């Protein structure tokens, strides 16, 4: 309701209640047959908490894809508008990362790896390409990139303004993420009709 990624109380995050809620949700998905859980909350020690819950509930082999380096970004705007999830009362700077702090961004992924994550991720993807190789080197874990709504919307707007072929723009944006050594890419890709590169 308030657009935050956790349970709030008096303009702050209640970490214990947030972890408890995430644990319940994750357990429901695992019981339904999910192999991988990908919590997007960016709260402190979520990966550690979920790993403990997995073991307690008999899901020791289930995997966690951590949103391990997720920035407080303006590129989430289109999604927030559609989902009506813009944060209310206070912003997300208490749990999402500042875009200017590379060391903190890498440290966050290292921490999630130590807590038991199986996969790591940078988000937004194209504004985080300088981090992927360093995170992989430090953690030895598969590290992916999330091409977020603002990135996707920019490709659509360039195409609609006749500044480029949509598929060309899309493929270039994804190729750059692969060049930056992303092991996997999450995207909002949608092609509504047959479209070919120019």
Give the location of each predicted region.
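Alpha/beta enzyme core
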Residues: 1-141, 146-185, 192
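Single conserved hydrophobic/aromatic residue that forms the stacking wall/gate
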Residues: 189-198
């Amino acid at each position: 309701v308030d657009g935050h990624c956790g349970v709030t109380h008096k303009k702050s995050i209640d970490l214990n209640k947030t972890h408890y809620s995430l644990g319940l949700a994750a357990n429901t998905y695992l019981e339904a047959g999910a192999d991988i859980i990908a919590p997007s909350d960016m709260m402190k020690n979520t990966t550690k908490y979920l790993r403990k819950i997995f073991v307690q509930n008999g899901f020791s082999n289930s995997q966690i894809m951590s949103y391990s380096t997720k920035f407080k970004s303006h590129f989430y705007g289109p999604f927030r508008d559609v989902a009506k999830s813009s944060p209310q009362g206070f912003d997300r700077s208490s749990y999402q990362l500042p875009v200017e702090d590379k060391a903190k961004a890498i440290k966050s992924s290292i921490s999630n790896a130590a807590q038991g994550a199986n996969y790591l991720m940078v988000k937004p993807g194209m504004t985080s390409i300088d981090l992927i190789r360093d995170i992989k080197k430090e953690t030895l874990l598969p590290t992916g990139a999330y091409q977020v709504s603002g990135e996707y919307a920019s490709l659509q707007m360039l195409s609609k303004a006749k500044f480029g072929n949509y598929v060309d723009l899309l493929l270039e944006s994804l190729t750059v993420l692969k060049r930056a050594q992303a092991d996997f890419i999450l995207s909002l890709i949608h092609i509504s009709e047959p479209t070919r590169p120019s």
